[in-house]
Amino acid sequence: METINLEKPLYSLKKFYFPSEWSYPINKNYKHIKDTYNEGVSCGIFEASNEKHFAYANGVLNCVTWFYPKYDYEQCMVAASIMLWIFVLDDFLERDHMTDEKQQYCVKKYEDILIFGKDSSYISNIEYNDLTPLDKYSLILRKRLLNPTIHRIESFNIFIHYLREWFFSIIPLKKSKGNNHDSVPIEVYQFIRTINIGLFFVVGVNSVAVRTNVHGSFWLNPIWNRMVRSASRQIIIFNDCVSYAKELNHDCAGENCLYILQKKLNLPFEKVYSELIAEAKQCIFDIQNDEKLLIKSLSHISEEEMNGVIYLVEQLHEIICGNRDWALMTPRYIHKDSPFIETNGIDSLFVPYETILDPNLY
């Protein structure tokens, strides 16, 4: 495990560029956090009175208040159900006891349950009370996704596609770093990480939680997809900087672009950080330019649908800025040995999210 030289000067994450007009006040709806946690309790994922379990869930679910500042309670519940499911599944698949065979079984099983529900061949012959905690919660999630899309099934299908792409990227990302934990080519890392960061489904939540009136084909629009990829890259860079110390400490630096580039390019931290700052800023400029191209290319659509497109563009802005604010406070990323002044000295060990999950969850 590598360590950070604390005698070196601290750097600042304020060098990242975020347009001031993209920020939006945090969502004041918090009820979804406790209600979603209680659903997890009812399925057996969490224990009702376990403070560590609630701290874990809160550390996951509070991202909804940052990412979706305009959502009402019901919309927050949709987003929170998704976030709890993906974080639990991601953390569970990273457990040391998970063999390659178990990992493959899990991703295939939960893909099937999301598609077919109780008719999935994995659980169709099992009584509900005998299902595993994650089986039960997957059914809750599926129902919550279906309810608002009952008359627009293409929205449900689009979102399931985004979820599927994400959870099939978990294992390749872990494998890509190789046995030396720093052997992944940066191009391979960037390709897999763009999917694994999950922004396509984070933005795609709007396809089920919000009636935007955009046609289903919009989600395939190449300009829109390029905007989401640019945003993904910006978020990857920012999150990798915030989580740099924690990933070094946990021997996960092989998945961190700030670390990978130091190794591959044989450049000092400060030089790599400056280059990443410039790249992240260019991503913002690319998004701003593509916004204009997107609106111009869709000049033929109705005013109602255009309003939906504008809503989604603004939501992309809100997620980028919301991620900044959430990343700087979530115990999933921050670490007391951070080389950045904004998070240095903050101890996040009170939420041991890597170890609290029941090994019999699935």
From Swiss-Prot:
InterPro entries: Isoprenoid_synthase_dom_sf, Terpene_cyclase-like_2. Induction: Expression is detectable but at low levels in vegetatively growing cells and increases during development induced by starvation. Expression is highest during mound formation (approximately 8-12 hours after induction), starts to decrease at the time of slug formation (approximately 16 hours after induction) and further decreases during culmination (from 18 to 24 hours after induction). A motif (DDxx(x)D/E motif) lies at residues 90-95. It comes from the Eukaryota. A motif (NDxxSxxxD/E motif) lies at residues 239-247. Its EC number is 4.2.3.-, 4.2.3.106, 4.2.3.15. It catalyses: (2E,6E)-farnesyl diphosphate = beta-maaliene + diphosphate; (2E,6E)-farnesyl diphosphate = aristolene + diphosphate; (2E,6E)-farnesyl diphosphate = calarene + diphosphate; (2E)-geranyl diphosphate = (E)-beta-ocimene + diphosphate. GO terms for biological process: sesquiterpene biosynthetic process; sorocarp stalk development. CDD domains: Terpene_cyclase_nonplant_C1 (cd00687). It holds the Pfam family Terpene_syn_C_2. Keywords: Lyase, Metal-binding. GO terms for molecular function: metal ion binding; sesquiterpene synthase activity; terpene synthase activity. It is an enzyme of class 4 (lyase). Belongs to the terpene synthase family. Terpene synthase that converts its substrate farnesyl diphosphate (FPP) into an unidentified sesquiterpene as a major product, as well as beta-maaliene, aristolene, calarene and 2 additional unidentified sesquiterpene as minor products. Is also able to convert geranyl diphosphate (GPP) into a mixture of monoterpenes including (Z)-beta-ocimene, (E)-beta-ocimene, allo-ocimene, linalool and beta-myrcene. PANTHER family: TERPENE SYNTHASE (PTHR35201), TERPENE SYNTHASE 1-RELATED (PTHR35201:SF2). Contains several highly conserved motifs that are important for catalytic activity including the aspartate-rich 'DDxx(x)D/E' motif and the 'NDxxSxxxD/E' motif, both of which are involved in complexing metal ions to coordinate the binding of the isoprenyl diphosphate substrate in the active site. This is Terpene synthase 3. It comes from Dictyostelium discoideum. The gene is TPS3.
